[in-house]
A protein has these predicted regions:
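Walker A/P-loop
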Residues: 58-78
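Inter-Walker segment of RecA-like/P-loop motor cores
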Residues: 107-158
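ASCE P-loop NTPase helicase motor core
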Residues: 112-114, 122, 167-265
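ATPase catalytic-site recognition across NTP-hydrolyzing enzymes
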Residues: 242-332, 336
């Protein structure tokens, strides 16, 4: 038997280590739910396992979730999975405000890092303040937060996440944020002409609660739902109402029941925020919401005199413009209701 030199022993050991790394990386890429359990020490609910598995498979993902379902936490987990297993990933989280997007990074810093020593060893630096929100990994992956505004131009991303996308301006999304995806992650195998054609597709994800059907967010949700049935595309669209939160013990049923009995309870708001339903025109309605919404011009509301006696700021009614006509309309509810006042008064 020929004895190996010290160099051959070292190379053999390195080769075995790298082969093991490649094997486990392939396994965890194909099974992100197992990565969460083994690497991040997070036990996901069944619906969360399904969601994160589909997030890993798709190129386009839309998730309409009820409040309290934990979409920010799930987004934080997915970002860590992507950053660790795909070195050099540029992950951008865009939202209407920087604080909203920073919640994902805070979930990583405050909840995931303390429970996973392995994740802690992967992270090089965490910076979260008023001007910068970024997590840098030792493998050159970066998770960064940007404000969804025209000033965000110039960014690049292999994964673009729009948090509460219904609050983002459509023009900013199309002309600024989507242009971030003009970037291709360049792993080492891309330098080999044999594998140069195996470039990875970038991903874009839209997370939000529901809103009105006249809004562009509903059109995007419908498009993703239709494309999900096209076998030539990798689209996924999910909607989970508050019943899922109750089923998985993320929300107490009694809490929802108490909310529904309060005098300030809003049926429309509840359907959007808790049932994850987009609200459209009521059947038989004379005017659609879009028809009325396009005519809204008043920024500051008019208050009844008996409501503003102790509030001088509210007493300052908007000045009447030249040629302006003000019409008072009253919609009287013909059926009595003890729970709420269905009358509507507008100017």
């Amino acid at each position: 038997m020929v004895k190996k030199t010290a160099r051959e022993v070292t190379e053999d050991k390195t080769s075995r280590i790298m082969n093991a790394v490649a094997l486990w990386a392939s396994f965890y890429r194909a099974n992100p739910q197992r990565f969460c359990k083994d690497y991040l020490n997070v036990n996901l609910k069944m619906f969360q396992q399904i969601l994160i598995y589909c997030m890993a498979l798709c190129t386009n993902f839309c998730f309409i979730a009820a409040r309290g379902l934990g979409k920010t936490f799930l987004c934080a987990i997915f970002c860590c999975w992507k950053a660790i297993l795909y070195p050099g990933s540029l992950i951008v989280i865009a939202s209407k405000t920087r604080n909203q997007g920073s919640l994902v990074l805070k979930k990583i810093e405050q909840e995931l890092v303390p429970r996973s020593p392995l994740l802690r060893s992967e992270i090089k630096d965490i910076t979260i303040n008023q001007s910068v929100a970024k997590i840098t990994f030792r493998n050159d992956s970066v998770i960064e937060v940007v404000t969804a505004a025209d000033t965000a131009r110039g960014g690049r991303a292999s994964l673009l996440i729009i948090d509460e996308y219904r609050m983002v301006d459509k023009e900013v999304l199309d002309l600024v944020l989507k242009k971030f995806l003009n970037y291709i992650r360049h792993p080492g195998y891309m330098d080999n002409p044999k594998y140069a054609h195996l470039a990875e597709r970038n991903q874009q994800m839209y997370l939000s609660s529901a809103w009105f059907e006249q809004h562009w967010s509903w059109d995007l949700c419908k498009d993703y739902f239709v494309n999900m049935f096209d076998t030539t595309k990798n689209y996924y669209c999910f909607r989970f109402p508050y019943q899922m939160s109750i089923k998985e013990n993320l929300l107490l049923k009694s809490q929802v029941e108490d909310e529904m009995t309060e005098s300030t309870f809003s049926d429309i708001r509840f359907r959007m925020e808790n049932e994850a339903l987009f609200i459209g025109t009521t059947d038989g309605g004379l005017f659609s919401f879009d028809d009325i919404n396009k005519q809204r011009r008043i920024i500051k509301a008019f208050y009844a005199p008996n409501m503003i006696l102790n509030n001088k700021a509210a007493c300052q009614l908007p000045a009447k413009k030249t040629g302006e006509k003000r019409i008072l309309t009253v919609d009287i509810a013909l059926m009595s209701s003890k729970r709420r006042d269905n009358d509507a008064t507008s100017i």
